[in-house]
UniProtKB/Swiss-Prot annotation:
Quaternary structure (record): Forms homodimers. Interacts with ubiquitin-protein ligase UBE3A/E6-AP; this interaction stimulates UBE3A ubiquitin activity. Interacts with host BAK1.
SUPFAM superfamilies referenced in this protein's UniProt entry, alphabetically: E6 C-terminal domain-like
Name of the protein this chain belongs to: Protein E6
Family: Belongs to the papillomaviridae E6 protein family.
unnamed zinc-finger residues: 11-47, 83-119
Gene from which the chain derives: E6
Source species of the chain: Odocoileus virginianus papillomavirus 1 (DPV)
Length: 135
């Protein structure tokens, strides 16, 4: 499957047609397509980020133990974990960064989420969920 697969699909929330840039973002983030009203749909970046924001704000996060630095939890290393800000899939290096810097993974609605390298670089390091998760 290539990025062309997502081109000309509709956003599942706002029903805008996805262009080349949105199609490439869906391909990079491995967004699953759905059928709504007979239309094949994915999600545009604006709707995805708004949905993730609402999920962070409305649902109480639960911290996830990821194992020690010497012995990582095998589930964390093998599971498909997405970024809680942009929806991208965390790479193995990003999962290692979480472990080495003792960053928390959190569970929202039975989904384990973390932070990707890009979102951490753009100033999202001091996440608001940290105060709630340690209590």
């Amino acid at each position: 499957m290539s990025a062309d697969y997502y081109e000309h699909l509709y956003c599942v929330f706002c029903y805008c047609v996805l262009g080349k840039v949105e199609a490439r973002r869906c391909y990079d983030k491995k967004i699953r397509t759905v059928v709504r009203g007979g239309l094949r749909c994915a999600v545009c970046t604006a709707c995805l980020e708004k949905g993730l924001y609402l999920e962070r704000v409305l649902n109480a996060p639960q911290p996830v133990y990821q194992g020690s630095i010497e012995e990582p939890d095998p589930f964390i290393q093998k599971a498909c974990i997405r970024c809680m800000y942009c929806g991208g899939i965390l790479t193995r290096d990003e999962k290692d960064r979480h472990r080495y810097f003792e960053e928390l993974y959190v569970i929202f609605r039975n989904q384990v989420l973390g932070r990707c390298y890009t979102c951490t670089r753009h100033g999202m390091c001091s996440a608001p969920y940290r105060a709630n998760a340690t209590g």
